[in-house]
Amino acid sequence: RFAVEIVQEIKKLCGKDFPVSLRYSVVSKTKGFGQGAVPGEEFVEFGRDMAESEKAIKYLEDAGYDMFNCDNGTYDAWYWAHPPVYMPPNCNIADVEHIKNFTTKPVVCAGKMEPEFAAKEIAEGRIDAMGVGRQNLVDPEWINKLLEDREEEIKPCINCHNACFNFNCSKGTPNMQPMDDALHLARCALTPPTMQHNKYKIVPTKNPKKVAIVGGGIGGMECALVLKKRGHTPVIYEKSDKLGGMYNYASAMSFKEADKKLLEWYDRELKKAGIEVHLNTEIDPINPLTRQYDEVIICTGAVPKKLPVPGFNKTITFEELLTGDKDHGDKVVFFGGGQSACEAAYELVLQGKHPIIVEYANDLIATPGTCLANASFLREMLVFKKVPIYLEHSI
């Protein structure tokens, strides 16, 4: 009724020809209050099922809506409406294709849509358009690059929700900028100038410098690109045999293909910008190499902490687990149930292994700042996969 009253009032004030689109969740994908249903799970729908949706969309069309921008889910199953990295691509397409048969109005499908896949669906008449949100935040020029056959230049969205939607699970941070420059919920972790162009405006320097960047991870590579845009001459020194740093491990999981593409994007952009890179080169403060630079920026990241307790030498690090440098067998116990641990545990589940999680807090991923869609998916998927989870336990 509320949606009907809204469109009727809009048409009354703006005219019957004024187009109005509705974001329409086809099915709720909900098992109960605060309980979403993950992909592959058999469940009894607690919210709107397909039979109700078939009737509802006709009712809403008759009320005056001109287009339906469709996805799935509710706030109890928010990972369907805003799919995190763990969700499969085009995850809502089957339900959206079905509901199109029950309306004469254009139907849009949203939810990690792949352009090539969407183009095929549109050409075959299964949907009328694809909905795109987050990719516009990370690279506002992506559609022009796609049309101009410059696809390799598109900076990929990694579906992290670390800036665009993390406000939903924490108190957030005060927005200190003028409202004409930024909206708190429309930012991007990979592209800081998004909706913050005044705060992060790249201004050409009047005093060009030669700058050494120690560390070639994501931070070091982004630093080099920004310095280059400003007119400086950055040079990257990386002690390993490849760029990427810790992100090489973070992107190793099977569901992080977009993260791998991001590393490839950085590599191409550095080469295109002509930025000098030295691999297998370790730099310290007394290294004579640093004397030839006006400035030195340290981007070395962090190393795993080794606890001075008996038996700690038998543990393996996050990097060793994900790269397979050490045999971890079939059962792996995670000391801590944060996002990294839950992601790695899910990866082991996908490999047919048997992870166990021991967490001191009263919930998994209890740290503020993680998006609800990411956290709830991992919690509910690990339960669905019957991963043993021990909360409020210590070792």
State what each model feature region is.
Residues 1-214, 218, 222-229, 304, ...:
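Flavin-dependent oxidoreductase catalytic cores
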Residues 33-37, 79-83, 246-251, 309-310, ...:
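Short acidic, glycine/proline-rich loop/turn micro-motifs
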Residues 64, 104, 125, 231-233, ...:
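Glycine-centered short loops/turns at secondary-structure junctions
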Residues 205-237, 278-290, 299-309, 314, ...:
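Rossmann-like dinucleotide/flavin-binding elements
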Residues 236-273, 345-393:
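Rossmann-like dinucleotide-binding cores of NAD(P)H-dependent redox enzymes
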Residues 257, 261-264, 281, 289-295:
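Catalytic cores of nucleotide-enabled group-transfer and carboxylate-activating enzymes in metabolic
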